[in-house]
Amino acid sequence: NNIFKAVNQFEIEGVNNQLRIPDGIVFVNGIPVVVLEFKSAVQENTTIMDAYKQLTIRYRRDIPEIFKYNAFVVISDGANNKYGSFFSPYDFFYAWRKINSDDKELDGINSLVTMIKGLFRKDRLLEVIKDFIYFPDNSDKDLKIVCRYPQFFAANKLYENIKAHLRPEGDGKGGTYFGATGCGKSYTMLFLTRMLMKSKYFSSPTILIITDRTDLDDQLSKQFVGSKKYIGDETVVSIESRE
């Protein structure tokens, strides 16, 4: 069994004997996988941006070892609650607004509850770490993509639907997913592809992606061909024509 511990005010001696005390750290089997930094919403001189800077600048400089196995970080001022990759710009930190896929989206102080119950549920946290954190095979910069909650729920729902309708028992219709512009559809497809390829239920499936736009074709082919390690298959190819 995995051992989960959430520790607050954990003292860490870092570079040049600097003592740093993150507000919260989540450990799984003794490994620090999430670091949390909180600011108070009632103090006008501190904001959630200060929490972001403290994590990604000060702690990154002074206690880099704590982030060696980091999955993601959390910043909060009580009213605004966001998570994201340690390497991401602030604009790419997002709230986790649902506990379950069919729930109503919540914001503000309620989003702290949805994050704790929705993202930090033990089985779900492990699921996010296993399948929903993406590294490209090669990159000239630090890049790590952590799923947003709509991507997590969509990929899981698609996976279960494909499984339920698999032939010969099923009708072979895995379902239709509609994603609005800017929702991160390409990453949803990437997360789903990894789930299918890594699943013990499916036996080395062949996954075919068809696009109807040249720009999307270029984007997806580059992304998938550059994600062989993440997907778990070396035979990822881009086909120019069906001829």
Where are these regions (language model features)?
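ATP-dependent helicase/translocase motor core
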Residues: 1-211, 215-231
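Inter-Walker segment of RecA-like/P-loop motor cores
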Residues: 225-243
